[in-house]
A protein has these predicted regions:
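N-terminal intrinsically disordered, acidic low-complexity segments at the extreme N-terminus
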Residues: 1-2
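N-terminal secretory signal peptides and thylakoid transit peptides that target proteins
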Residues: 5-24
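Short extracytoplasmic
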Residues: 53-83
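Rieske [2Fe-2S] iron-sulfur-binding domain
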Residues: 89-183
Length: 183
């Protein structure tokens, strides 16, 4: 009987040693892999480029500015009441985005005059004209892509030409009445 109990104690001790050894190996492997995983995270300079704040106070009604965000041009336009009205009168059924292209969904509530768009044509990546006062704004008063003739309206929606979708709206928020944070 004593030898049988001794064998059980040996098996329990062996199982414990195997378990402890495996746990020790797992902790060792994790501590070796951690630096390799951490080096894949973005550093402080990359994180700083992921968002940008823009002061909108100097931009008067009817004016537009272009800023860079993640290396892409972002169009910011302080739209006039006439531009907003024209954008909202459009029959949404005739637009590629349908009801998802409603002007109200492309701007922030309470700041409907501010339109923020990624300034890259969705056809082949050209930069549309329409930001400067003398630029051609296309047939719909918004932007015109000179590469292949896409026309966007005052809400950045594709109205004519080969572009497959509307100009993209980047993630942004108003941090105050005159400042936005993109990204």
């Amino acid at each position: 009987m004593a030898s049988h109990t001794n064998e059980i104690d040996e098996a329990d001790r062996r199982d414990f040693l195997v378990l402890a050894g495996n746990a020790f190996a797992a902790v060792g492997a994790a501590s070796l892999l951690w630096p390799f995983v951490q080096q894949m995270n973005p550093d402080a300079s990359a994180k700083a480029l992921s968002s940008t704040e823009i002061d909108l106070a100097p931009v008067k009604e009817g004016q537009a500015i272009t800023v860079l965000w993640r290396g892409k041009p972002v169009f910011i336009r302080n739209r006039t009441a006439a531009e907003i009205e024209a954008a909202r009168k459009v029959d949404l059924d005739k637009l590629p985005g349908g009801t998802d292209a409603a002007d109200e969904l492309r701007v922030k509530k309470g700041h409907e005059n501010w339109l923020v768009l990624v300034g890259i044509c969705t056809h082949l990546g050209c930069i549309p004209k329409g930001q400067a006062m003398g630029d051609a704004k296309g047939d719909f008063g918004g932007w015109f892509c000179p590469c292949h003739g896409s026309h966007y309206d005052t809400s950045g929606r594709i109205r004519l030409g080969p572009a497959p979708r509307n100009l993209d709206v980047p993630p942004y928020e108003f941090v105050s009445d005159t400042k936005i944070k993109i990204g």
